[in-house]
């Protein structure tokens, strides 16, 4: 079998930068899936992407499918010949359809009889004749939410397509993609190098584009070059560049020939909170801010241009002129906002509707304030020192920064600007920090607040939304979640679990519902919210790699304290790894099945005088021996140690089921043994329903 390297490039108008990686990865995955379905082996495959092109390179691709033999079964011999031994019409028709005579057919004997068969040789198809159709199917599967048409073309794609190149080694693959006929023309950089050139071989794609077209088609190479050059530029300034991967990806998707330059802005702008300046530089301009080693913003920024200029200073000056008005706006907004305190803005929240049925933002902050104070009190009552006055105050001020000029213009600074303005207003540091941290965690992988006041406010903010929206019957359906309730639910669970807060969801939900008063129309709000949170718990732990049966075993106990839930999950996960776990899980399942069949109330008291068999005596004695050790462990939530102790019951339990007839004819003996099993099961149920472990 012969092999060659394949290149496919689709040349387009500028592609959406935030979608570039996804498009390229999807193209590669779908195309290699097509190769696999077509029985075309290959060594490896990579994708390339730049603002005006998507490309895939398949290495070591077979030039044709392998020939194969396909067994085509015909009629049974019993129905293939008549009484005289002549072929029937059915046999003749089958043979004719396969291009043979009945006499040429082979016979296959199976346990169900004897059959006529034909071993048909199927010649493999040349790869080059399959490529275009496979590539088109792969392109059709790209995740394109809003495809577009261009010119008189009925073809749809994410952006207009200008060129298509398909090369198998040096051979041009015939065919069309997206209405464009395959040719050797590759377009270069818009302003540098050759506008277009012909590619002679698939292996020369990257080098020819770089040398002739001034385009670095290797996405990861562009990304690494930008990062390295930006870090070096920042080091020359004595600082560190803020190069978050999301922005780096976007910048790498905007340029074909990245050139990193350094610029500056007036130091007076550093009097504005750095978050607002950074938001402007990163969000609007796609610049990399620079900080000193102490984390203080420097009056410099790093940007990436798509052209190698003879006069880079002109480009630098141009970018400085562009960013200055934005920084001046931030300075103006900050100085204007400082003239009014956050407290003075509370009244204006009455003019903003949070949600039609749930009232205004003023009503919302009043609910958050009371709920945050309640949560802080609950934390205090359970040994976690929290200033409930600060929690209530932070809740009341939590949305006031939404009424400032800065946040209205730079929306992503909400919370952060609240913190800065609170400090200027003389609010306590705990209140100021809580205003910023109320929204945490904002995304998957984000940190959670750790300060107790911040935790109380963050929980209150999320619970108010969750209970309110569920209360008016607008729970998430399918993928739709307009109020981000799933994120809020995960946030609630993470704040409680990661800070080990002794809080009960039932109590928090009940308080939040009471504060909504007449807003609530759903009579099952509390139950619905709790079920939603428990479902999020399951999803969260699954994402962390916890086995489903472990989660279900804990969920069966319906623990409503997330920190306690977490301890149980960790304990059961540990127990699952013990040698005794499989046998004890099976025994618990057997016990559950036996007890489920008992009519009426289960016997609860074990009468030692009725323990007649050595195995049941040994099990009862072991339980009596363990209970004084288990009780304090259950009380302290030390479930892992408790289950480790219970694992010692394995031999006793195995021997019990080996030697003892539970459902004895003697009613007293039977009930006593049922009581023993009830007691055994209850010890495990203090932690989880172990019978659900697989």
UniProtKB/Swiss-Prot annotation:
Keywords: Aminoacyl-tRNA synthetase, ATP-binding, Cytoplasm, Ligase, Nucleotide-binding, Protein biosynthesis. InterPro entries: DALR_anticod-bd, Gly-tRNA-synth_bsu, Gly-tRNA-synth_heterodimer, tRNAsynth_Ia_anticodon-bd. It catalyses: tRNA(Gly) + glycine + ATP = glycyl-tRNA(Gly) + AMP + diphosphate. It is found in: Cytoplasm. One of its GO terms (molecular function) is ATP binding. Its main location: cytoplasm. The keyword Transferase does not apply. Pfam families: DALR_1 (PF05746), tRNA_synt_2f (PF02092). Its EC number is 6.1.1.14. The keyword Cytoplasm applies. GO terms for cellular component: cytosol. HAMAP family: Gly_tRNA_synth_beta (MF_00255). Belongs to the class-II aminoacyl-tRNA synthetase family. PANTHER family: GLYCINE--TRNA LIGASE, CHLOROPLASTIC_MITOCHONDRIAL 2, GLYCYL-TRNA SYNTHETASE. This is Glycine--tRNA ligase beta subunit. It comes from Shewanella frigidimarina (strain NCIMB 400). The gene is glyS.
